[in-house]
Curated annotation (Swiss-Prot):
This is Bombyxin C-1. It holds the Pfam family Insulin. The modification Pyrrolidone carboxylic acid is found at residue 20. Disulfide bonds join 27-76, 39-89, 75-80. Belongs to the insulin family. Heterodimer of a B chain and an A chain linked by two disulfide bonds. Its main location: secreted. GO terms for molecular function: growth factor activity; hormone activity. SUPFAM superfamilies: Insulin-like (SSF56994). It is found in: Secreted. Silk worm has two kinds of PTTH: 4K-PTTH and 22K-PTTH; there are many forms of 4K-PTTH. Brain peptide responsible for activation of prothoracic glands to produce ecdysone in insects. The keyword Repeat does not apply.
Amino acid sequence: MKLVMLLVVVSAMLVLGGAQTASQFYCGDFLARTMSSLCWSDMQKRSGSQYAGYGWPWLPPFSSSRGKRGIVDECCYRPCTIDVLMSYCDN
């Protein structure tokens, strides 16, 4: 009986604890909006000259990204966590 109760408690802790770090798919506009909200504290609508010449910090230049895993490989094709997304923010 004690073993069953211990297994129930451990299972509940794993389920509740895992909900905070659950993996999710991030693709397209959802990925862009999520990265904007994670990397910049106040998400603002882009207006022409305000962001002129300002690139997306989590996307490497096309020429250097060949053959390497990027954010789409990690979070769109497979589920990833918020911690993985935040690792792409330019700190």
